[in-house]
């Protein structure tokens, strides 16, 4: 679901061109990207399927979009979620009680063409199956694209890699990685570069958006710890929002209290201190990415033989993939030798 910090980050977000990300390493929240691919392939929001009725949208999106990123000179690392913290499971269980209501909202969002809303409800309903995740990992391996299995939250791991300088940005549509301390987040890199306006036959250009944590904190004159408390008042993946509090009110409350722990205590947020501490110190691991050579036969087996993808189209895409990866690996080699 992600935390809704849109109003808080909007004053400082910057629209950029894809070419400005040339040579940059981006740690992409894999689950977030797979949800995007799952629902953004077709305009009706319904997933693509093979001849056996199995969903293939996640593979199509992952394959072609990753190649597009590589052609822009972007070096992606996909970060997969591990074991969720126990308070996230509790939050999921509570939300499942409203499953019928969520299912209705999900279908309504699809009908209206509001894919972002549909994705939000799909996440709560658990529309991403484990076999899709495993297929995605196999495809990335075949493509020569690095991925890391996070011990817990993918966005926490992506934030850690960005803080360490392994990656230049976290790539996600959500804002959670800011709470985990990522210095920079880039949005709109795993979605189509043209988006249909809900209910209209009009397409608008979608550009990457960069949000810097320091800019957010400086604009509102708050600390990262206070930003976490604000997010908790607004509702996160781990706790329900406090009724009647919007973004501006949340900022005022946290500034008035000063100490974020006092805010959590005053509003009696369930597991509040534990959640707060988790945002500050989540489980993470070290990772050194390597971009390899594509295994053409294996890609063909996964996409064409197993899932009925068009062989000519896949063949052409593999050529693009090989060319883009060669270029990236050559540049990495040159920079290693200081050329």
UniProtKB/Swiss-Prot annotation:
Enumerate the cofactors the protein uses: Mg(2+)
| Entry binding sites for Mg(2+) 2 | 174, 176, 237
The record's remark on the cofactor is: Binds 2 magnesium ions per subunit. They probably participate in the reaction catalyzed by the enzyme. May bind an additional third magnesium ion after substrate binding.
Q: Name one GO molecular function term.
A: 5'-3' exonuclease activity
* Coiled-coil region: none
Q: Which residues bind Mg(2+) 1?
A: 29, 81, 153, 155
Q: Enumerate the UniProt keywords alphabetically.
A: DNA damage, DNA repair, DNA replication, Endonuclease, Exonuclease, Hydrolase, Magnesium, Metal-binding, Nuclease
Its function, per the record, reads: Structure-specific nuclease with 5'-flap endonuclease and 5'-3' exonuclease activities involved in DNA replication and repair. During DNA replication, cleaves the 5'-overhanging flap structure that is generated by displacement synthesis when DNA polymerase encounters the 5'-end of a downstream Okazaki fragment. Binds the unpaired 3'-DNA end and kinks the DNA to facilitate 5' cleavage specificity. Cleaves one nucleotide into the double-stranded DNA from the junction in flap DNA, leaving a nick for ligation. Also involved in the base excision repair (BER) pathway.
Which family, according to the similarity comment?
A: Belongs to the XPG/RAD2 endonuclease family. FEN1 subfamily.
Protein's UniProt name: Flap endonuclease 1
Q: Which organism is it from?
A: Nanoarchaeum equitans (strain Kin4-M)
């Amino acid at each position: 679901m992600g935390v809704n910090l849109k109003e808080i980050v909007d004053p400082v977000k910057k629209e950029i061109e894809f070419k400005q990300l040339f040579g940059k390493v981006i740690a992409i929240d894999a689950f977030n990207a797979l949800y995007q691919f799952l629902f953004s392939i077709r305009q009706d929001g319904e997933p693509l399927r093979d001849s056996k009725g199995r969903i293939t949208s996640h593979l199509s999106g992952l394959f072609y979009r990753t190649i597009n990123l590589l052609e822009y000179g972007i070096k992606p690392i996909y970060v997969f979620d591990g074991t969720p913290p126990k308070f996230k499971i509790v939050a999921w269980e509570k939300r499942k009680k409203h499953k019928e209501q969520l299912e209705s909202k999900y279908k309504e969002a699809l009908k209206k063409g509001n894919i972002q809303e549909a994705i939000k409800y799909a996440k709560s309903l658990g529309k991403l199956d484990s076999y899709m995740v495993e297929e995605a990992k196999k495809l990335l391996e075949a493509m020569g694209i690095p991925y890391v299995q996070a011990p817990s939250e993918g966005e926490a791991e992506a934030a850690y890699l960005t803080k360490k300088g392994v990656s230049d940005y976290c790539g996600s549509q959500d804002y959670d990685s800011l709470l985990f301390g990522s210095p920079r987040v880039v949005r709109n890199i795993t979605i189509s570069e043209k988006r249909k306006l809900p209910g209209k036959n009009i397409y608008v250009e979608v550009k990457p958006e960069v949000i810097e944590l320091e800019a957010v904190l400086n604009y509102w004159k708050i600390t990262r710890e206070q930003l976490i408390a604000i997010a908790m008042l607004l509702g996160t993946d781990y706790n329900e929002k406090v009724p009647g509090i919007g973004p501006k009110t949340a900022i005022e409350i946290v500034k008035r209290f000063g100490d974020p722990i006092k805010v959590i205590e005053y509003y009696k947020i369930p597991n509040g201190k534990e959640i707060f501490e988790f945002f500050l110190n989540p489980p993470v691991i070290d990772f050194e990415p390597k971009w390899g050579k594509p295994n053409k036969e294996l890609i063909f087996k996964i996409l064409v033989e197993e899932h009925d993808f068009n062989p000519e189209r896949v063949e052409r895409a593999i050529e693009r993939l090989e060319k883009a990866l060669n270029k990236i690996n050559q540049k990495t080699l040159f920079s290693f030798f200081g050329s």
